[in-house]
UniProtKB/Swiss-Prot annotation:
Residues 185-233 form a coiled coil. The lineage of its organism: Eukaryota, Metazoa, Chordata, Craniata, Vertebrata. Phosphorylated by CK2 and PKD kinases. It comes from Homo sapiens (Human). Component of the CSN complex, composed of COPS1/GPS1, COPS2, COPS3, COPS4, COPS5, COPS6, COPS7 (COPS7A or COPS7B), COPS8 and COPS9 isoform 1. In the complex, it probably interacts directly with COPS1, COPS2, COPS4, COPS5, COPS6 and COPS8. Interacts with PMF1. Interacts with the translation initiation factor EIF3S6. Interacts with CK2 and PKD. Interacts directly with ID3. (Microbial infection) Interacts with vaccinia virus protein C9L. Widely expressed. Expressed at high level in brain, heart and skeletal muscle. GO terms for cellular component: COP9 signalosome; cytoplasm; cytosol; nucleoplasm; nucleus. The gene is COPS7A. Disulfide bonds: none annotated. It comes from the Eukaryota. Its main location: cytoplasm. Component of the COP9 signalosome complex (CSN), a complex involved in various cellular and developmental processes. The CSN complex is an essential regulator of the ubiquitin (Ubl) conjugation pathway by mediating the deneddylation of the cullin subunits of SCF-type E3 ligase complexes, leading to decrease the Ubl ligase activity of SCF-type complexes such as SCF, CSA or DDB2. The complex is also involved in phosphorylation of p53/TP53, JUN, I-kappa-B-alpha/NFKBIA, ITPK1 and IRF8/ICSBP, possibly via its association with CK2 and PKD kinases. GO terms for biological process: COP9 signalosome assembly; protein deneddylation; protein neddylation; regulation of protein neddylation. This is COP9 signalosome complex subunit 7a.
Amino acid sequence: MSAEVKVTGQNQEQFLLLAKSAKGAALATLIHQVLEAPGVYVFGELLDMPNVRELAESDFASTFRLLTVFAYGTYADYLAEARNLPPLTEAQKNKLRHLSVVTLAAKVKCIPYAVLLEALALRNVRQLEDLVIEAVYADVLRGSLDQRNQRLEVDYSIGRDIQRQDLSAIARTLQEWCVGCEVVLSGIEEQVSRANQHKEQQLGLKQQIESEVANLKKTIKVTTAAAAAATSQDPEQHLTELREPAPGTNQRQPSKKASKGKGLRGSAKIWSKSN
């Protein structure tokens, strides 16, 4: 596995400055250096240069075509045209394979090993995993190798150069995304409105309960004060009423005792005469 590299624009800027004044064979050589340079994975600015486009109609048309394959294509595209394109160095092969993984990751985030092995023309899983680890170290993608399920799970990947014919599809995708955002926003606003209504209802109910509690407290307070006032007007009279029994009760009790006594004395007298 090669040393760790990071995707930066520093090397690319240097190549762009050199390419502005280069032509012919010198420019073709510079393009091959760009394709091999670590950390350079976008080539759109280089392709847009007029002197680079002139290569398409020159003896170095194959170099220009190779540059377009690195910008927009995959390793399978290169193999399909390999007879008409310059040979690749090992570093160029790995870079184009990295870009091919990025293209696959743009379509699906869980890529089976079998798909990768075929797309990258690799012989075994060990080579595939080494290539993916190298791409991760280069910050081309982030993810994990699921060896149990034999697949690559991609969390992030860099963007690739965009062709002009792809702009309409991108605009359509963005338009659909905007429509989806509007639908989500409308749903959120509706939920917020319902939440505010529920909040107002609960506040009204709370105020009503607090008002009823306050009125109840006032009623209890007034009733208690009135009872206390009534008790404190003549406390001695109130105590007397509690201590003295009712007049009707006192009159009935002695009469009962008297009748019982007379009955006993009368019966005694009758018993004496019989004796």
